[in-house]
Every structure is written in C-alpha cells, then in structure tokens.
Amino acid sequence: MYISLGRFLKKLRLENEEHLYDMAVKLKVSSAFLSKVENGKSKPPTKWESIIENEYKLTDDQKVDLCRCIQEARNNTTIN
C-alpha cells in the first residue's frame, strides 16, 4: 500500500508516542522544517533514511517503505 513520507513519519511518531518536535530533535532539524517535509513543501535530506532507520529500529518492510517514500518525496516536492 502506498503512503506518503508525511504519513509514514506521522505514523512512526504516533507508534513511538512522540510529537513533531521529538522527531525533529532526532533528525537534527527544526520542527518547522520537518513539518514542511511532511507536507511536501521541502525535500527530505539524504541522510534522513539512515538516521530514521537507526533511531527507530525499523523492520525490513518499514525500511523499504521509507526508502520509497523518501524517493517519491524528492521527486514530487511542491513549492508554494
């Protein structure tokens, strides 16, 4: 099933009982930037994939989904 990077990250946060700020700290970005990425307004940094995999101990299926979501987000970012 296809999900966007924003939905993937939000689901991951909820599963770990975190707020946007908590994930932003782990990713070493501001909450505002993380929000922009989640909403498709900014592209995710290339290093996020490995940081998220390590910080959240993703399953193999989650790693595949994350990779696909990040690639899709890099290709489809909307600028307003």
What kind of feature is each model-predicted range?
Residues 7, 11, 25, 36:
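DNA-binding alpha-helical recognition surfaces that contact promoter or target DNA
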Residues 62-80:
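Short, charged recognition helix plus adjacent turn
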Residues 28-44, 51:
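Recognition helix of helix-turn-helix/homeodomain-like DNA-binding domains
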Residues 1-15:
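A short, Lys/Arg-rich alpha-helix, primarily the initiator
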Residues 10, 21, 50:
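Residues within the helices of the helix-turn-helix
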Residues 13, 24, 53:
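The alpha-helix within a helix-turn-helix
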Residues 47-65:
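DNA major-groove recognition helix of helix-turn-helix/homeodomain DNA-binding modules
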Residues 16-35, 66:
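Short alpha-helical DNA-recognition segment
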